[in-house]
Amino acid sequence: MNPKPILFLTVAQVAALLAQEPRPLPADLKVERDIAYAEPKNQRQMLDVYPPAGEKNLPVVVWVHGGGWRAGDKTEVASKPLAFTRKGLVFVAVNYRFVPNVTMDTIARDIAKAVRWVHDHIAERGGDPQRIFLMGHSAGAQLAALVSTDDRFLKAVGLSLAILKGCVPVDGDTYDVPLQVATVAARRKSLGQPDPKFGYEEKFGPPDRQRDLSAVRHVARNKGIPPFLILHVAGHTDTTAQAHRLWSELREAGVPAKTFGAAGTDHVRLDRDLGVPGDPSTAELFNFVEAALKK
């Protein structure tokens, strides 16, 4: 009997392969789709807004999808819009451009531009521009964490970290990019696997760029970095290590931070189940949001 080959996929590849299909909207959930946050207009620089009807001055969640920085879409939000709007928050889902068409720092600038649009226009849709939470899954987790720690991105669009009430990166594996590059290289070597054609090094660039695109490298005291809740899959070695690496840097800098390892789930399900009643990670997330809004 010939043994079946074992296929090893990265976190980002799994997310891209299993991207969620958009679901029909419930009757009580409204959405304003395909709003351009940059010029000239293109589909990768647009966002969707889910506003609770008839409300004003509500806190806002800006959600950044995953997909390995090469795939994914703002429509892949599963239960999140309904869950957040029912909790009294405006939910915004953003698209961004992909590598290799643009560089990784350009993608981070896209996220900052989307936040700028939210800051300038969300009051018209019931939101409070001074109470924004930046969240994301997988590749989106790296982007959310980077923009929430490296203040150059928001400063470039005329904003500061002060508008962020919190950051929730979900199961990211690149808060410390050089660490992940070394981890993956060692694992490939031990398993006798070939180098990928377009892996982390191709996406992030040489070591100096990898360091500069790592959220951990920008954590420092007195920068106004918002509180963090770092969600991860408890059984995933890489994302657990990265979550604790980021948590350690934040705590060392005096930034309120917490990790939560979700048991009995995986990378895709953790994202998909956020917003589902009874989901432990969802409970942690809403507890975090509630506490952050009291400060």
Give the location of each predicted region.
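Primarily recognizes the serine-hydrolase "nucleophile elbow" in alpha/beta-hydrolase
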Residues: 116-183
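Short beta-strand element of the alpha/beta-hydrolase
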Residues: 57-67
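Mobile cap/lid helix-loop segments that gate and shape the active-site cleft of serine hydrolases
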Residues: 21-25, 40, 178-221
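N-terminal cap/lid segment of alpha/beta-hydrolase-fold proteins
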Residues: 20-55
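C-terminal catalytic histidine-bearing segment of alpha/beta-hydrolase fold enzymes
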Residues: 48, 229-295
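Catalytic nucleophile-loop/oxyanion-hole region of alpha/beta-hydrolase
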Residues: 36, 72-80, 92-130, 274-278
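A fold-wide structural signal in alpha/beta-hydrolase
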Residues: 60, 85-92, 97
